[in-house]
Each structure stands twice: as structure tokens, then as C-alpha cells.
């Protein structure tokens, strides 16, 4: 847990104005579909901040921020990978490539995207739906 949650000015200074807009749009899209707990944390070695969407002790996804970069991570477990693989041709090339290049660990595939625009957002929502049905109408 962070002592102080970064404000708009701090986030804009960190990732830049255009990526901060992507961050805001991605958060809005997730919030539109899911009622989740949202937790700010330190981003570990590679990132400055982590912003995690969780409910009932399970993580849906996490957003990450560092200098001039925004990350979106989703972890697909075994059953979720099977669902993705059955439907993979309906995902864009970049999502398929990242899926294929991501190492599989004992607890799943930790897929990290670094969006610079909104072009992958439909695929992100489709991936999130594999993990959990939207709970907002």
C-alpha cells in the first residue's frame, strides 16, 4: 500500500500527458464493466506504481506506471488459457504475439502490455471477460 496516492500532476509528470490519457481511459473502461477494489502499491523493481483491480481476494488485472510508460497486466491461469486458445483468432495480432511470447509459470501466463493508444482496449476487455464476467450493467 502506498503512503500517498499519486495525483494527476505526478502521474502526468511520470508517464507524459498522452499516456496519462490512455491510463485514464483504460481505468474508465474497466470501471464501466467491473465494480472492484482498487489498490495502489509500489511498482517493484521495474515500475514506479502498481494499480491493482481486485475483488474477493482475486486480482482481475493491474496497471503499472513508470517514466514514459504505462503497463497493463493480466494473468491467465490454466482454464483461462484454454478459453483464450479456443478463441485466439478473434484477438488482434499483437495480443496473440504477446500471448505466445509470454512464459507460462506454475500459476499462469503473466501477460504484460504497454499500450500507447486505445487500439487494444477491445481485446483487453475480452481478456478480462475470460477471467471474470462484468459485474456492472
Question: Positions of the model-derived regions?
Answer:
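Charge-dense, helix-prone N-terminal extensions
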Residues: 1-137
Amino acid at each position: 500500500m502506498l503512503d500517498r496516492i499519486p495525483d494527476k500532476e505526478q502521474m502526468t509528470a511520470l508517464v507524459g500527458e498522452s499516456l496519462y490519457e490512455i491510463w485514464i481511459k483504460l481505468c474508465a473502461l474497466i470501471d464501466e464493466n467491473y465494480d472492484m477494489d482498487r489498490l495502489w502499491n509500489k511498482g517493484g523493481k521495474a515500475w514506479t506504481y502498481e494499480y491493482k483491480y481486485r475483488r474477493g481476494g482475486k486480482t482481475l488485472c493491474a496497471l503499472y506506471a513508470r517514466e514514459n510508460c504505462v503497463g497493463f497486466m493480466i494473468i491467465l491461469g490454466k482454464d483461462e488459457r484454454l478459453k483464450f486458445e479456443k478463441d485466439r483468432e478473434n484477438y488482434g495480432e499483437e495480443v496473440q504475439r504477446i500471448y505466445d511470447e509470454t512464459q507460462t509459470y506454475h500459476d499462469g501466463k503473466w501477460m504484460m502490455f504497454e499500450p500507447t493508444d486505445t487500439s487494444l482496449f477491445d481485446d483487453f476487455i475480452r481478456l478480462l471477460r475470460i477471467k471474470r464476467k462484468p459485474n456492472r450493467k
